Each structure stands twice: as structure tokens, then as C-alpha cells.
């Protein structure tokens, strides 16, 4: 039996506001020959492009299993926070340039994955923000997916236990 050595690396890049309170995009690339995805979630929880939180790990692992090699992680709200406080003024939660980063990322990708789960069902403020964003994302509806488990067509967040190790990507339209 012979031994095989494999090497790999993940290139990280992030764009922040000048005061590091908002993150607009986090890019991760591990194989530039493979497909690209944009994953849209609710808010970033770290300002360190090298820190891998559980959500980012699950996104990378599941996309890699689905033969992707690149992801742009973007969020509906750009404020970096461990827990989203919806009592904060909308202008403090999301900077004006955030949607521009989302739209530019969507123009250069193979798949746009809506990964916010079902939060809009419990929060009217988030539902309104997502509705505004979805209007802007209309040109990309042909490559728009939600994360589902193997048993349902219910939208899931990457941290949902039922999709922790396998994503079933279902077309939105």
C-alpha cells in the first residue's frame, strides 16, 4: 500500500466598513476550477476573515460536497454582531453599499443560495427587508436556490441540524 499526500488551502478575503463594524462580503476560494456560489444569510457575526465560525464551516463543507470551489458570503444586514437586535434603527443595521456587494456577487456566480431559513415568518422587520432585497435580486431568479433537507421543501439555515452534513438545493422559481 502506498501513501498519498494531499494539500489544499482556502483563500479568504473580506470587505469591511472603515470602522470594522460592518462586513459587506466574505470570499472563500478552495478550487477556482469549480463552480461559484453566493450564499445570502442574515448578518455577519465575525470581523475576522480567517476565523471560521460554525456557519462558515458548514457552508464550505456542504458546497464542497456539491462540487463548488468558491463562495461569496453576503448578508441582508451588514452590521457585525453575535445576535441581531432588530430594535436598532434600520440604517445602523445595514449600510447603503451592502446591496451593491450582494448584486455584484450575484452577477458573477453559478448559484445564488438563500440561506436565511424561515426567519421572515417570525419577524415582520426582517420580512420587509428580505422583500426589498428580493426585488433587487429578480434578475438572478433563474439561478436562485434554497437549502432543504432530503425530506421537505422547507427553507433551512446552514446551522439547522437537518442540513448540517448534506444540502438539497431546491430552485426557488
Which functions belong to the PLM regions below?
Residues 24, 53-60, 91-100:
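Short acidic (Asp/Glu) patches
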Residues 36, 69-70, 111, 143:
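Residues at the starts of beta-strands that form the adenosine-phosphate
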Residues 45-67:
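A short mixed-secondary-structure module that forms the rim of ligand-binding clefts
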Residues 46, 80, 120:
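Feature marks short, surface-exposed loop/turn motifs that line or immediately flank catalytic pockets
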Residues 69-85:
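Short connector loops at secondary-structure junctions
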Amino acid at each position: 500500500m502506498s501513501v498519498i499526500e494531499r494539500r489544499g488551502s482556502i483563500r479568504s478575503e473580506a470587505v469591511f466598513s472603515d470602522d470594522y463594524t460592518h462586513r459587506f462580503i466574505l470570499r472563500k476560494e478552495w478550487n477556482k476550477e469549480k463552480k461559484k456560489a453566493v450564499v445570502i444569510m442574515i448578518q455577519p457575526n465575525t470581523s475576522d476573515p480567517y476565523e471560521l465560525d460554525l456557519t462558515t464551516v458548514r457552508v464550505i463543507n456542504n458546497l464542497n460536497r456539491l462540487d463548488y470551489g468558491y463562495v461569496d458570503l453576503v448578508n441582508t444586514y451588514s452590521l457585525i454582531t453575535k445576535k441581531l437586535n432588530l430594535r436598532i434603527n434600520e440604517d445602523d443595521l445595514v449600510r447603503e453599499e451592502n446591496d451593491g456587494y450582494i448584486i455584484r456577487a450575484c452577477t458573477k456566480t453559478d448559484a445564488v443560495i438563500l440561506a436565511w431559513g424561515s426567519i421572515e415568518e417570525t419577524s415582520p422587520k426582517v420580512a420587509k427587508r428580505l422583500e426589498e432585497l428580493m426585488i433587487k435580486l429578480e434578475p438572478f431568479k433563474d439561478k436562485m436556490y434554497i437549502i432543504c433537507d432530503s425530506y421537505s421543501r422547507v427553507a433551512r439555515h446552514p446551522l439547522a441540524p437537518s442540513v448540517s452534513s448534506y444540502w438539497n438545493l431546491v430552485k426557488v422559481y
